[in-house]
């Protein structure tokens, strides 16, 4: 297991109360040895005006996953902040849920890189993201 902080899924989800994460309906669903996953509904909260998943909502899910994964890699007295987010949209989604899978690309002392892939309910890739974070403290 790569994580330096040991939280349960319930504890991870409790951190989202009264935040954008909760408003968008994002829920952490899996914390594996080197992977963090979450789901987000594709509904009125996350749609753009034409009834499709908003690219900004996809980016919010990706940044949420990468930032929390980054936090799990810090020690007491440290935190992470996002420095760069890139998202490539591959497929539109109009309903259901989108699942995000976050894996490390680079875990340095001062910076981290995370790959977050979003999938529709049929398991098709709909967005590929990369988040860079800086370790503070």
From Swiss-Prot:
<dbReference type="Pfam" id="PF03061">
    <property type="entry name" value="4HBT"/>
</dbReference>
<dbReference type="GO" id="GO:0061522">
    <property type="term" value="F:1,4-dihydroxy-2-naphthoyl-CoA thioesterase activity"/>
</dbReference>
<keyword id="KW-0378">Hydrolase</keyword>
<dbReference type="GO" id="GO:0009239">
    <property type="term" value="P:enterobactin biosynthetic process"/>
</dbReference>
<protein>
    <recommendedName>
        <fullName>Proofreading thioesterase EntH</fullName>
        <ecNumber>3.1.2.-</ecNumber>
    </recommendedName>
</protein>
<comment type="pathway">
    <text>Siderophore biosynthesis; enterobactin biosynthesis.</text>
</comment>
<dbReference type="GO" id="GO:0005829">
    <property type="term" value="C:cytosol"/>
</dbReference>
<dbReference type="InterPro" id="IPR026576">
    <property type="entry name" value="Thioesterase_EntH"/>
</dbReference>
<comment type="function">
    <text>Required for optimal enterobactin synthesis. Acts as a proofreading enzyme that prevents EntB misacylation by hydrolyzing the thioester bound existing between EntB and wrongly charged molecules.</text>
</comment>
<comment type="subunit">
    <text>Homotetramer. Dimer of dimers. Interacts specifically with the aryl carrier protein (ArCP) domain of EntB.</text>
</comment>
<dbReference type="InterPro" id="IPR029069">
    <property type="entry name" value="HotDog_dom_sf"/>
</dbReference>
<keyword id="KW-0963">Cytoplasm</keyword>
<feature type="active site" description="Nucleophile or proton acceptor">
    <location>
        <position position="63"/>
    </location>
</feature>
<dbReference type="InterPro" id="IPR003736">
    <property type="entry name" value="PAAI_dom"/>
</dbReference>
<dbReference type="InterPro" id="IPR006683">
    <property type="entry name" value="Thioestr_dom"/>
</dbReference>
<comment type="similarity">
    <text>Belongs to the thioesterase PaaI family.</text>
</comment>
């Amino acid at each position: 297991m790569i994580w330096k902080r040991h939280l349960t899924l319930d504890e991870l989800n409790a951190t989202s109360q009264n935040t954008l994460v909760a408003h968008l309906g994002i829920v952490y669903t899996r914390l594996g040895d080197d992977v963090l996953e979450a789901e987000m509904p594709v509904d009125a909260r996350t749609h753009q005006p034409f009834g499709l998943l908003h690219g900004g909502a996809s980016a919010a899910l990706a940044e949420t996953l990468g930032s929390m994964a980054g936090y799990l890699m810090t020690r007491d007295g440290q935190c992470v902040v996002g420095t760069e987010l890139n998202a490539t949209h591959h497929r539109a989604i109009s309903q259901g849920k989108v699942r995000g899978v976050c894996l490390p690309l680079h875990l340095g002392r001062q910076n981290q890189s995370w790959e977050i892939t979003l999938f529709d309910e049929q398991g098709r890739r709909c967005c590929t993201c990369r988040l860079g974070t800086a370790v503070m403290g």
